[in-house]
């Protein structure tokens, strides 16, 4: 029996030529802008892309010309396929906004007996999990795939996943006095109007911070404070807050450890925004300590976690 696991994520430019494609596809996603009229959404996406293209390209250039998400995901896939090498199970991936898209990946497995879709987002949101699954399901329909389809949903409450987070946090401050450091969980912000329509993202993120905080306390790890802040605001609408820049500007300790709680794989928002852009704010405020914890990425712990989740269903 041929079984396939497709890891789903947002994607990111693999080179500077893909920056425009990434922006255009992201802003043309009906789950992002919330505009149902395709023509209006397309025009607005084009305008936003043109306005942001130069600065986004400059940001990617600082990252070496590409987002890290592609290379890390491919490494993760390779490690998973090696781990399951003796079983009739194949791992692959699909991105929402850059190649390989869902239809590109799924066409390779049109005759698989079973396909497991695994969105790599710990919290539920229409802008992430729903959008990725919608793209995959549209591809499945277009390709007339008759395979048995299974889905792994959000997993922020999973203790195995959260132990990866707490372990990476503890490792980062192993030689530090954590009681003098403020731990800030940074989450990708969303417009409040999306939350007001019933999106679970804010609730799940708040609950996740509480779960991790309790686990750290149980392990005897004490921080000066633990808080949640948001990043990546865009445009004049009202967004979830507080903004990370405001939190950093008002931080009296001048010592901050940042954990990107929205992401399983590092990308431009972690490697550029958190590690470069917000670090500049910390430098301007003369911080004594500012560090960003890496996402689970292609670590052996995350490989083992994905294997555990997959074995539950296949």
Swiss-Prot record:
Q: Which Gene3D superfamilies match?
A: 3.40.50.1400
Q: Where in the cell is it found?
A: Cytoplasm
Which SUPFAM superfamilies does this one have? Chelatase (SSF53800)
The reaction(s) annotated as catalysed by this protein in its Swiss-Prot or TrEMBL entry are:
heme b + 2 H(+) = protoporphyrin IX + Fe(2+)
Fetch the InterPro entries from UniProt.
Answer: Ferrochelatase (IPR001015), Ferrochelatase_AS (IPR019772), Ferrochelatase_C (IPR033644), Ferrochelatase_N (IPR033659)
Q: What pathway or pathways are given for this protein in its record?
A: Porphyrin-containing compound metabolism; protoheme biosynthesis; protoheme from protoporphyrin-IX: step 1/1
Q: Where does Fe cation bind?
A: 188, 269
Q: Which GO terms describe its biological process?
A: heme biosynthetic process
**Keywords assigned:** Cytoplasm, Heme biosynthesis, Iron, Lyase, Metal-binding, Porphyrin biosynthesis
Molecular function terms from GO: ferrochelatase activity; metal ion binding
Q: What domain of life is recorded for the organism?
A: Bacteria
Q: Which GO terms describe its cellular component?
A: cytoplasm
| Coiled-coil region | none
Enzyme nomenclature, EC number: 4.98.1.1
What does the sequence similarity comment in the record state about its family?
A: Belongs to the ferrochelatase family.
Q: What does this protein do?
A: Catalyzes the ferrous insertion into protoporphyrin IX.
Query: What's the protein called, per UniProt?
Result: Ferrochelatase
């Amino acid at each position: 029996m041929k079984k396939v696991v497709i890891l789903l994520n947002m994607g990111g430019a693999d080179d500077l030529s893909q920056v425009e494609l990434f922006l255009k596809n992201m802003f043309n996603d009906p789950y992002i802008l919330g505009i149902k009229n395709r023509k209006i959404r397309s025009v607005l996406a084009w305008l936003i892309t043109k306005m942001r293209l130069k600065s986004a390209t400059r940001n990617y250039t600082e990252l070496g010309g590409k987002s890290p998400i592609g290379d890390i995901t491919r490494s993760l896939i390779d490690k998973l396929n090696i781990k399951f090498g003796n079983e009739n199970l194949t791992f692959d991936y699909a991105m929402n906004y850059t190649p390989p898209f869902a239809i590109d990946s799924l066409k390779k497995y049109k005759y698989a007996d079973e396909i497991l879709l695994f969105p790599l987002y710990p919290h539920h949101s229409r802008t992430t999990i729903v959008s990725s699954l919608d793209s995959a399901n549209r591809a499945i329909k277009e390709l007339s795939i008759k395979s048995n389809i299974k889905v792994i949903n959000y997993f922020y409450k999973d203790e195995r996943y959260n132990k990866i987070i707490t372990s990476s946090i503890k490792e980062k401050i192993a030689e530090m006095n954590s009681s003098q450091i403020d731990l800030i969980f940074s989450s990708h912000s969303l417009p409040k109007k999306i939350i007001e329509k019933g999106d679970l993202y804010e609730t799940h993120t708040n609950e996740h911070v509480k779960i991790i905080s309790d686990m750290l306390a149980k392990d005897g790890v004490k921080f000066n404070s633990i808080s949640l802040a948001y990043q990546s605001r865009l445009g004049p609408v009202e967004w979830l807050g507080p903004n990370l820049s405001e939190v950093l500007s008002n931080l009296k300790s001048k010592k901050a450890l940042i954990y990107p709680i929205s992401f399983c794989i590092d990308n431009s928002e972690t490697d550029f925004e958190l590690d470069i852009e917000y670090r500049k704010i910390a430098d301007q405020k003369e911080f004594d300590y500012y560090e960003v914890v890496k996402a689970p990425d292609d670590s052996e712990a995350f490989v083992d976690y994905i294997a555990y989740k997959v074995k539950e269903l296949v």
